Structure formats: C-alpha cells, structure tokens
C-alpha cells in the first residue's frame, strides 16, 4: 500500500450548478514536493483548499496521514499564501515570535527555531528590521518562515516565487528542497513558473476543468507528451541530407524530419534516448556529424499539449 501523506478521494465541489472540481482522486506521498498545475479557473485552488481543510467538499473525503482531515491535530499543515500576510510594523523576529506564540510553541523551542529560520532564509541581518522596510524578496521569504514556524508536517506553497529576482528565487528553491530532503516534510507547490515546477517537483498533477488529466514525474511527462525534443544536425556531406531524412522518417516515435538551411531537424519524443540509433543511420550512409545540438522537450510544451493553453490564460 502506498505511503500517502494526503489522499483525496473522489473530491467534488459544486457551486450553484457549476462543478469546480469533478471527482478528483490524488495521493500525495510523504516527503515529496508535489507540483499542482492548471490554467486559471481549472479548479486547482479549490482542490487544494479542500485537501487542507479550508473548504468543505460537496462530496468525497480527504485523509491526512491515515486520519480524516476533520480529526488531524492543529498545526499539521502550514500555509504560505501568494498574498503577503505580514505585520508591517513588527520586526522579522517579532513577527516570528508572535506566530510561534499563536501556535503555542514553547519558548525553549521557539527561540532557536526563530534563529534557524532567520539563518536559513538569509534574514538574520534583518532580524530587528521593521517589515515595512524590507525588500519584496525578503518579505516573501519571511512569509514562508511564518508558515513553517510551528514545524508542520505538510507545507502548502502558493506561487512562492511570485515577483522574486533570480537570486532570491534560488534561496527559496534551496529552502524548499531542504524541507523535503533534510526535514522530511511534504510540500504542495502551485506555480506558474514552469522551470520552478520542473526543478522542484518529484511529481506533478495537471488539472483542467476540475479533472485530473495527468499525474507523473516531470521527466516522464516530458518524455511521453508534447511536441518532442529537437535534434539539430549538420552532416559532413549535405548531399546526403535527403538520404538520412528517408532513413529516419519511418522510425518509431519520430514526429518529423526536415531540412532547414542545409541542416537536419529531427523532432521526436525522448530524442536523447534515440540518438544512438540516429547515429547508426548516419554511419550507414558513410558520413559524419560535424555539428549537433539538442533542445529538450519542456514542461511548457507538455502543459500546452494537455490543456491547449498557456498557464495564465
């Protein structure tokens, strides 16, 4: 039996005849970063709210660590919303202490935990700085620290990198990885940044029109779905280009082979895995490859293939 931290079983949510979420069943494993993607209006926010107990489903149920969600202990889940939920007139340290007190964290545990969060999220030098004077990146990192001050087993991150510069984004990404790899937390991540979902997620669920349409690892999604990788190849003898095109076109999972400005463009699912066979066909023609490059299929390609739209449409 799979060791799930959260199980959504046949979740459905209806609003006056509109079905926002339609019979959704998902299992989120303990200690994984679980990406949750979908176009605007797809039902992902409604789904997550039901899965963490903020919204009652019309039907279906949610099991958290073997218990009905209605019976889990306070503080099991930490929420980091996209909107900054900060006290502008408090310092970073005062904010963390206040949130810890709300969760009744004992002082002997609270103090070292506050300091560790300030260190891990590069806020130590701003510990006594009033929140209103922090940069946008610092505020977003503090927003995350407030969500995890009570050491929740499950952390929900809603667009955590929104508006961040690349340096701040890397700090945040490293901390998210550490929550999984060092602390063993289960992280649910929603994001419109495809590279973020790809880099951080162990598995990704893509939903549209309230239904789950695909659930797999980023690597498997890119291998199996989308327009395919592109191999751009230049032969030592361009006169052999058409011969190679005829050799490769009938091959299984080759989507297209065309000549562009004296080079050959080969589009195929999991093209990297097919490179050895491509090279065998080149050798058969008695030519060599002078130049080659590969552009891998992206998660953006996969998303558009499955939903027919961009992430923010």
Label each region the model flagged.
Residues 97, 101, 108-126:
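Conserved ABC ATPase "signature" region
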Residues 130-134:
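Conserved ABC ATPase signature
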Residues 151:
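Conserved catalytic motifs of ABC-family nucleotide-binding domains
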Residues 155-158:
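Catalytic Walker B motif of ABC-type/P-loop ATPase nucleotide-binding domains
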Residues 174-269:
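ABC transporter nucleotide-binding domain
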């Amino acid at each position: 039996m799979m060791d799930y931290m959260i199980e959504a079983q046949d979740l459905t949510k209806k609003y006056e005849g509109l079905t926002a979420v339609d019979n959704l069943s998902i299992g989120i494993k303990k200690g994984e970063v679980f990406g949750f993607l979908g176009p605007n209006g797809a039902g992902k926010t409604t789904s997550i709210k039901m899965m963490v107990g903020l919204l009652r489903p019309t039907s279906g149920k949610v099991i958290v660590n073997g218990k009905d969600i209605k019976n889990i202990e306070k503080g099991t889940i930490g929420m980091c919303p996209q909107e900054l939920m900060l006290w502008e007139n408090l310092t970073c340290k005062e904010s963390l202490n206040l949130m810890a007190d709300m969760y009744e964290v004992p002082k002997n545990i609270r103090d070292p935990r506050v300091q560790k969060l300030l260190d891990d999220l590069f806020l130590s030098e701003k510990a006594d700085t009033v929140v209103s004077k922090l940069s946008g990146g610092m505020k977003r990192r503090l927003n995350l620290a407030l969500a995890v001050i009570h050491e929740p087993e499950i952390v929900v991150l809603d667009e955590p990198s929104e508006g961040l510069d690349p340096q701040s984004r890397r700090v945040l990404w490293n901390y998210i990885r550490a929550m999984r790899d060092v602390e063993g937390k289960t992280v649910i991540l929603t994001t419109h940044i495809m590279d973020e979902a790809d880099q951080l997620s162990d598995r990704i669920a893509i939903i549209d029109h309230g239904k789950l349409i695909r659930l797999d690892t980023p690597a498997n999604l890119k291998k199996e779905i989308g327009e395919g990788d592109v191999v751009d190849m230049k032969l030592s003898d361009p006169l052999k280009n058409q011969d190679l095109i005829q050799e490769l076109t009938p091959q299984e999972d080759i989507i297209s082979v065309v000549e562009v400005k004296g080079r050959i463009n080969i589009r195929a699912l999991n093209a990297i895995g097919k490179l050895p066979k491509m090279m065998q066909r080149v050798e058969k023609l008695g030519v060599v490859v002078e130049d080659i490059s590969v552009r891998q299929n992206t998660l953006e390609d996969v998303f558009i293939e499955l939903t027919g739209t961009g992430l923010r449409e």
